[in-house]
């Protein structure tokens, strides 16, 4: 039996999230397992690094599965992609040791939230970005973001339906990058709570719109009451772009994406 890790990219627009649900509900996991099972000629179950909600995209999702099928890595990629719908792609495949676990071996995660800040809505990328039609004060948003970096209780920034045992997370960095009319919020943490990035984005956008001062982000954090924060930002602009693992697993290093952004962003 061989354990295999895959890098997965998907457009979450037409999915009800990552996780397998009842029959007839379209999820990324369901599509991926069906495709891999055809290649393996046996039933395949995948374990992902992090589940994403309906409408959320992934460029750096990582999964693992076990198989005794005698397939080369390129066969998993080519065969899998042949059997996958057009909105899911296998980016890479590598054999890993039995102690590798897509979720529990991860040391950090990185998300990007992409905002199109323009008076007119986009026609081509309407499901890949969040449109904000009024100017945003990026300097104020950066100041607000600075209050959230570090080890904190993020109760006020998680969904009321979040089932995580602890609201304590370490936000390593929270950066804002301007690419013309596109604003990219990049969050890097040991792990994230349900809706955490989207709730952070909602607060920062409210600050950027001048409706709240930057220190309000800190006030929301310290109140530990979700009801006192901003509305949860839409899922369309959110991307899971990277899962970081110890170097000993030697997983491929790919551009974070989405692919229409430069490989390297500068503040």
Swiss-Prot record:
<comment type="subunit">
    <text>Homodimer.</text>
</comment>
<keyword id="KW-0413">Isomerase</keyword>
<dbReference type="GO" id="GO:0003723">
    <property type="term" value="F:RNA binding"/>
</dbReference>
<dbReference type="InterPro" id="IPR020097">
    <property type="entry name" value="PsdUridine_synth_TruA_a/b_dom"/>
</dbReference>
<comment type="similarity">
    <text>Belongs to the tRNA pseudouridine synthase TruA family.</text>
</comment>
<feature type="active site" description="Nucleophile">
    <location>
        <position position="53"/>
    </location>
</feature>
<dbReference type="GO" id="GO:0160147">
    <property type="term" value="F:tRNA pseudouridine(38-40) synthase activity"/>
</dbReference>
<dbReference type="GO" id="GO:0031119">
    <property type="term" value="P:tRNA pseudouridine synthesis"/>
</dbReference>
<dbReference type="Pfam" id="PF01416">
    <property type="entry name" value="PseudoU_synth_1"/>
</dbReference>
<protein>
    <recommendedName>
        <fullName>tRNA pseudouridine synthase A</fullName>
        <ecNumber>5.4.99.12</ecNumber>
    </recommendedName>
</protein>
<feature type="binding site">
    <location>
        <position position="111"/>
    </location>
    <ligand>
        <name>substrate</name>
    </ligand>
</feature>
<dbReference type="InterPro" id="IPR020103">
    <property type="entry name" value="PsdUridine_synth_cat_dom_sf"/>
</dbReference>
<dbReference type="InterPro" id="IPR001406">
    <property type="entry name" value="PsdUridine_synth_TruA"/>
</dbReference>
<comment type="function">
    <text>Formation of pseudouridine at positions 38, 39 and 40 in the anticodon stem and loop of transfer RNAs.</text>
</comment>
<dbReference type="InterPro" id="IPR020094">
    <property type="entry name" value="TruA/RsuA/RluB/E/F_N"/>
</dbReference>
<keyword id="KW-0819">tRNA processing</keyword>
<dbReference type="InterPro" id="IPR020095">
    <property type="entry name" value="PsdUridine_synth_TruA_C"/>
</dbReference>
